[in-house]
Structures are given as structure tokens and as C-alpha cells.
């Protein structure tokens, strides 16, 4: 199973927290000390906590669970999308729309509209419209694709959230808490770990650190999914005898 070592984390700068004046005292158990007014995260804590989170995500994936990757900060946006797509999962990487989980019924209608517009753009409907109308629909399609493209094929609520930056994505975490969906999150020294089921204390800004987390999660999810596919193949093989 995918695991991450202390050396990998040091190389990626996972241990660098935020400036000491911005800290959240709830993160004290995970802080090693401070250097040049910047908190240093205790990787002796992070390594086992991250590997425990990976093992749990592996289990969820092996049971056909759907994992929603959430990271809407500009620096992490593309990496979040790439990681989710690389393991056939789902993502929100631009803006978290309030109610995305708690008001799923409305979101589902917007997804239906997105899919209708996609069909229209491909089957020649747009070409039959006036220029103005076609432009309006193209803009609507782009807007919907931007906000819902990563969840349009999710087909219902996710079974887990993997979040980059618990502070930035607090609305998503709150919605998941309300629905009892487990939250796995990177929690930096300025963030509140409450509401996160699997806390991963670490730097949530450095792109190398973010890429490290996402790569490991995507790998463990792929592995979990292949176990699920292997067991399905075994079952069908037994039935065929």
C-alpha cells in the first residue's frame, strides 16, 4: 500500500507551518517548535497520521467508495484535478458553492442542466441558435463546467472528502460533518482541526508538499479500486465454474 516516509516529507517541506503569530492553539500537540518565527510541524506525528489516513482511504476505495478531492486555492487547483482524475474520483477545485453537499437535490438539477448543455454543444443545437443565444449558452456551460465539472458523474454524495487546507475549505468540512461524511484533511498550524476525522498536520501551501499528499492519496485509491476489481473478477470466475 502507498505510504510516505519522513524523508519524502522533509524534502517536500511538509514540516514548515505558518508564522507563529497566526497559529491555532488547537494545533499545539502537532507542533515541534518554532524557527525564525515560523512553526515547525512535528513529522513524528504527521508520518503515522498520514499513513493511517491512506490505509483508511484504501479501504473506502476497495469498497467502491467515492472520494471527493477538495482544493480551491489557485496554487493547488490543477494538482487537485489531476490527482482526482488519475484515480477515477471526483473534485471541486475552483469555488465551493454553499450547499454543494447539504443541498444535493438542487446541485443535481444544475448537473442535469450542465449535461443538457454539453449535449446541445455537441449535437449541433448551438449552431441553430442566434449568435447571442449561442454565446449565452456557451458561457453558462463554461460556468457550470467550472464549478460542477468535477462532480458531474459522482451520481450522489461522496463517501469521503480529502481536503487540502482545512482552514480555506471550512464550509465543505462543515457540510460533510452535517451529513456524517468522513473528512481527511491537511491541517496547517493556523487551522482548526475540529471537524476533521483524519487530521494530517502539514504545510498546505508549498506546491511540493501538496503534490506529495495528492500523489500518495491517488496511488492508494487506485490500489484500493484494483482490489475491488480483482475481487469482482474472482466472484465472476467462481460463478462461471
UniProtKB/Swiss-Prot annotation:
**In the UniProt record, does the keyword Heme occur?**
no
Q: What superkingdom does the record give?
A: Bacteria
- Mind listing the UniProt keywords for this protein, alphabetically? Ribonucleoprotein, Ribosomal protein
Record-linked CDD domains:
RPS2
Question: So what family is this one in?
Answer: Belongs to the universal ribosomal protein uS2 family.
Where is the organism placed in the taxonomic lineage, from the top?
Bacteria, Pseudomonadati, Pseudomonadota, Gammaproteobacteria, Enterobacterales
Naturally occurring in which organism (per UniProt): Escherichia coli O139:H28 (strain E24377A / ETEC)
The record, for HAMAP family, names: Ribosomal_uS2_B (MF_00291_B)
Molecular function terms from GO = structural constituent of ribosome
Q: Which GO terms describe its biological process?
A: translation
InterPro entries assigned: Ribosomal_uS2 (IPR001865), Ribosomal_uS2_bac/mit/plastid (IPR005706), Ribosomal_uS2_CS (IPR018130), Ribosomal_uS2_flav_dom_sf (IPR023591)
Protein name as it appears in the record: Small ribosomal subunit protein uS2
Amino acid at each position: 500500500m502507498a505510504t510516505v516516509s519522513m524523508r519524502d516529507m522533509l524534502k517536500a517541506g511538509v514540516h514548515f507551518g505558518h508564522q507563529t503569530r497566526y497559529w491555532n492553539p488547537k494545533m499545539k500537540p502537532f507542533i515541534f517548535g518554532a524557527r525564525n518565527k515560523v512553526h515547525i510541524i512535528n513529522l513524528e506525528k504527521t508520518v503515522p497520521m498520514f499513513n493511517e489516513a491512506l490505509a483508511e482511504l484504501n479501504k473506502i476505495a476497495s469498497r467502491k467508495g467515492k472520494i471527493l478531492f477538495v482544493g480551491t486555492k489557485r496554487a493547488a487547483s490543477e494538482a487537485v484535478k489531476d490527482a482526482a482524475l488519475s484515480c477515477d474520483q471526483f473534485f471541486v477545485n475552483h469555488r465551493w458553492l454553499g450547499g454543494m453537499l447539504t443541498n444535493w437535490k438542487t446541485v443535481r438539477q444544475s448537473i442535469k442542466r450542465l449535461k443538457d448543455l454539453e449535449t446541445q454543444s455537441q449535437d449541433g443545437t448551438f449552431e441553430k441558435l442566434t449568435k447571442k443565444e449561442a454565446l449565452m449558452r456557451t458561457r453558462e456551460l463554461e460556468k457550470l463546467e467550472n464549478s460542477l465539472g468535477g462532480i458531474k458523474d459522482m451520481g450522489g454524495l461522496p463517501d469521503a472528502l480529502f481536503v487540502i487546507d482545512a482552514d480555506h475549505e471550512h464550509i465543505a468540512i462543515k457540510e460533510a460533518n452535517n451529513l456524517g461524511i468522513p473528512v481527511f484533511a491537511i491541517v496547517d498550524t493556523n487551522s482548526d482541526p475540529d471537524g476533521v476525522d483524519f487530521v494530517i498536520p502539514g504545510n498546505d501551501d508549498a506546491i511540493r508538499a501538496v503534490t506529495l499528499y495528492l500523489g500518495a492519496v491517488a496511488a492508494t485509491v487506485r490500489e484500493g479500486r484494483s482490489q475491488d476489481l480483482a475481487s469482482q473478477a474472482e466472484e465472476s470466475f467462481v460463478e462461471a465454474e
